[in-house]
Structure formats: C-alpha cells, structure tokens
Amino acid sequence: MVHLTGEEKAAVTGLWGKVNVDEVGGEALGRLLVVYPWTQRFFDSFGDLSNAGAVMGNAKVKAHGKKVLNAFGEGLKNLDNLKGTFAKLSELHCDKLHVDPENFRLLGNVLVVVLARHFGKDFTPPVQAAFQKLALGVATALAHKYH
C-alpha cells in the first residue's frame, strides 16, 4: 500500500493519462540497461545490448518496457493493494528469474527521470514527489516475495 494524498493521486493519475506507454516504457527500460549495465544479465534473449544505441533501438527492450509500464499502470488502479496487484510478478521475479529486488527501485527512479524528460514543466517537484512515492511503493510490492 502506498499512501498518497488526494492531491498526489490526482497529480499521478492526471499525468499518467498522458503517458505514451510504448515510448516511455521502452525508454525507461532502455535507460535502466544502459545506466546500470549489470541489469542486462536478465535479458540475454533480447539480442544486441552491446552499446547505448543498440539498447535504445532494441525492439525487445521497447516491447518489454511497454509491458512493464502497463503493469505499473495496473498498480495505479489498485493503490490500496499494491502487494496483491504485484504478487504474481513478485513471485516470478523472485523464484524464477532471481532478480535483485534493488533493480525495482532503480527502474522506478529511471522512470521518474524519463517522465521528467517527457513532461518538462508539467513534471513539477510535487508531481515528482508523488511519482517517487508511487515508484517506491511499486518496488516494495514487487520485492514482497523476497521477504
């Protein structure tokens, strides 16, 4: 569960309605893989990830980024039950994929950077604070199975 004020919920849902999940998702995952290259080990089947250009242009990275953002959007619809919403994904990432749960926090932070880049002046400090809070809530829910 993430505790957002009414104002924070309005800011997050209002901006999220304008997010192009194809574009933002691919960019967020791509940036994660470039900025934190050790995360690439979970994406061996994605082909060429040898440099920033290859990563950012990789169709599989873009498709998976879209999938990730769609899941994030589901979390927005279920703010009072993030653990339940992400229970199956938490289990998958913990038991089968063995993803370090810190990567969820890193991805959330990268997502905030990408949103700031895309929305500029509309991504005010209060909007950023609300998204940081939400991203941490999602990361915590995804890490739940690890505890």
Swiss-Prot record:
Protein name as annotated: Hemoglobin subunit beta-2
Annotated organism of origin: Chalinolobus morio
GO MF terms, alphabetically ordered: haptoglobin binding; heme binding; hemoglobin alpha binding; metal ion binding; organic acid binding; oxygen binding; oxygen carrier activity; peroxidase activity
GO cellular component term, pick one: hemoglobin complex
Source organism phylogeny: Eukaryota, Metazoa, Chordata, Craniata, Vertebrata
Residues modified to Phosphothreonine: 124
Keywords for this protein: Acetylation, Heme, Iron, Metal-binding, Methylation, Oxygen transport, Phosphoprotein, Transport
Span of domain Globin: 3-147
Tissue and organ expression note: Red blood cells.
Modified residues (N-acetylvaline): 2
Residues recorded as bearing Asymmetric dimethylarginine in the entry: 105
